[in-house]
């Protein structure tokens, strides 16, 4: 173990040239790679020889020379060593003063080295009382910072923002700076970075830390984005969608966070108004509708339906005659539809290619499925193209109530599914859907499937044999959520 680090300490300095050959580049890469491999299984106490390796890397990164060396590989080794080291030992090798100087250096490699050290600080709030966080913020929100540096700083935020002291340093100590960037920054790239930072902080935020003036976006800013820069508007949509998703995901462990959504109510209604009047804003209709729909979907899944019901009744109007009714029925929470739009559910969800997305959505609720199952007949399913059949069955095979219905009431469909005749499976997409349906079904108890369990396992074996020479990974859920 120690030998590989001793070797790099002895040999690497002699390979550092500014115009070296491919041979010297390959040799230096080999030395670095050996160290990386040695670290994989390393669990002991770092040695003085390893300390010397870190010091060597520091000197290389600090040099004004651009050596013929793989700097990405070197940074990877630095990262792995920082991870493996006890952090008090790291602080003996990197003082706060050194890190600040490195972060302020015009040499980007040193900036990124500092990011690595701060990212893996232990505890994560260790540097909250230093200026390092302030400098990182300045560089993160500097339009001249490179993509590599910005990505490295984002890793710092994602790792350290879980600490309340770090969040306080970012959101309170730097409140004036962040507010200035938010309200006065004409650069869309920097504004988008700020939104990303706020999203990261919000993930760990307590509801008491939520400041409307920082986390909310004014009506003027949103309208200016609609008129002048649709990409900024899309970023704002994605920002709020992420905020709402975080609240929904954390509703069990952090229920008080729902107040943040209520604070956003006026903004939500503004998005609804923009949707309702989309004909006045061609860019929204052409580029941003899908982003609004993602936001509406998340809001419809909240247990507290007051905000979404107000949005529905006042602006998006889930009702007959709405040109986007099929879309809404395909992604709005089926439980919301069941509670508020029962008559529409009763009139929709017929088995035809144009309404498969509706049935797939309604299948996720047992209440909705009980209403539409009368429309799901073997004749209608088998009348559709085979791919559409599989798309429908892929969703029906995920829930116990619809699996039971499929196994007990649609024998013709089950028979078609397990048929050994695969001539209709002309493309890989169809094959993948069929295999996913079969896999979903055989996950259920034998009692649930009755006589179909054994034929399904045989059908799976046949599928695997049919495409034995191909990778059988599926990507269905990414296409149909």
Curated annotation (Swiss-Prot):
GO biological process annotation, one example: mismatch repair
Gene3D superfamilies, per the entry: 1.25.10.50, 1.25.40.580
Pfam families: HSM3_C, HSM3_N
CDD domains: Hsm3_like
Disulfide bonds listed in the record: none
UniProt superkingdom: Eukaryota
Keyword Cytoplasm (UniProt): yes
Protein name: DNA mismatch repair protein HSM3
Organism name: Candida glabrata (strain ATCC 2001 / BCRC 20586 / JCM 3761 / NBRC 0622 / NRRL Y-65 / CBS 138)
């Amino acid at each position: 173990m120690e030998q590989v680090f001793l070797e790099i300490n002895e040999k690497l300095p002699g390979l550092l040239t500014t115009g070296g050959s491919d041979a010297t580049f390959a040799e230096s890469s080999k030395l670095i790679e050996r160290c990386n491999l040695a670290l994989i299984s390393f669990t002991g106490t770092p040695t003085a020889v390893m300390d010397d390796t870190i010091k060597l890397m520091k000197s290389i990164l600090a040099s004004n020379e651009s050596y013929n060396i793989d700097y990405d590989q070197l940074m990877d080794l630095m990262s792995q060593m920082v991870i493996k080291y006890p952090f008090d030992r790291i602080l003996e090798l990197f003082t706060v003063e050194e890190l600040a100087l490195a972060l302020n250096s015009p040499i980007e490699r040193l900036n990124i080295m500092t990011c690595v050290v701060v990212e893996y600080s232990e505890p994560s709030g260790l540097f909250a009382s230093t200026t390092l966080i302030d400098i990182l913020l300045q560089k993160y929100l500097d339009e001249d910072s490179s993509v590599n540096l910005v990505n490295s700083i984002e890793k710092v935020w994602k790792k350290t923002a879980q600490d309340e002291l770090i969040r306080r340093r970012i959101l309170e100590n730097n409140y004036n700076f962040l507010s200035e960037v938010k309200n006065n920054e004409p650069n869309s790239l920097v504004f988008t970075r700020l939104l990303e930072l706020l999203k990261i902080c919000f993930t760990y935020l307590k509801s008491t830390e939520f400041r409307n003036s920082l986390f909310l976006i004014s009506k003027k800013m949103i309208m200016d984005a609609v008129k002048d820069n649709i990409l900024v508007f899309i970023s704002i949509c994605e920002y709020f969608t992420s905020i709402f998703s975080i609240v929904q995901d954390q509703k069990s462990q952090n229920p008080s966070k729902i107040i943040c959504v209520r604070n956003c109510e006026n903004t939500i209604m503004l998005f609804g108004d923009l949707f309702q009047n989309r004909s006045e804003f061609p860019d929204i209709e052409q580029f941003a509708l899908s982003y609004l729909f993602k936001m509406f979907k998340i809001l419809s899944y909240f247990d507290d339906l007051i905000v979404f019901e107000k949005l529905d009744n006042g602006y998006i109007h889930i009702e007959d005659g709405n040109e986007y009714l099929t879309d809404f029925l395909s992604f709005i929470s089926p439980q919301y539809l069941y509670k508020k739009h029962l008559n529409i559910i009763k009139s929709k969800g017929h088995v035809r290619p144009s309404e498969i997305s509706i049935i797939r959505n309604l299948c996720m609720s047992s209440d909705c499925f009980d209403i539409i199952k009368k429309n799901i007949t073997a004749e209608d399913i088998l009348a559709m193209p085979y791919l559409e059949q599989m798309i429908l069955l892929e969703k029906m095979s995920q829930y116990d109530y619809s699996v039971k219905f499929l196994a007990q009431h649609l024998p013709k469909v089950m028979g078609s599914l397990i048929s050994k005749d695969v001539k209709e499976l002309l493309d890989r997409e169809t094959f993948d859907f069929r295999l996913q349906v079969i896999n979903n079904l055989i996950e259920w108890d034998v009692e649930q499937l009755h006589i179909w369990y054994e034929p399904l396992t045989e059908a799976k074996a046949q599928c695997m044999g049919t495409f034995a020479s191909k990778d059988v990974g599926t990507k269905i859920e990414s296409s149909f959520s």
